[in-house]
Amino acid sequence: MIMKRLLIIYLALCFWGECSYAVEKQKDIEILYNRLLEEYLSDSIDVSQAEKDLAVMQTDGSWKDIDYKTVTFYFDADRHLKRLRNIALAYSKPGNKLFHKPELRKKIVLGLDYFRTVNPDSGNWWYRDIGAPSQYMVPLLLLKTEL
């Protein structure tokens, strides 16, 4: 009987410890998120370029002038992520005419979905494992609360 109680107390303490650990880690993640958000929102944006890119974006979230299929050292699909980043910045940064336009958010999500679905390859491990994911995350972070 005493062993059962000790076991229950031990398990309760372990569970409590894990919960507080998870809460602390979540706080750390929020600190990192806020720092990244602050850094990205301090970047300059080209609103007129974002408007031009939006105007020629295809209904599937792609751009006609980008080659998503050819595997080359120069990764043409990189321009897709750079455009999405600029558009996401225009959407997220207060004080410009594209700030929080609902149709803009839909197009950003469409562009992210297209890139994820097509999954273009450069043939270069660095871009596949580091470059593209680090660029892909920027619109995701900027729209975190809305996705």
Question: Predicted regions span which residues?
Answer:
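Aromatic-lined, polymer-binding surfaces characteristic
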Residues: 51-147
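Boundary at the C-terminal end of the N-terminal hydrophobic targeting segment
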Residues: 19-24
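N-terminal secretory signal peptides that target proteins for export/translocation
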Residues: 1-3
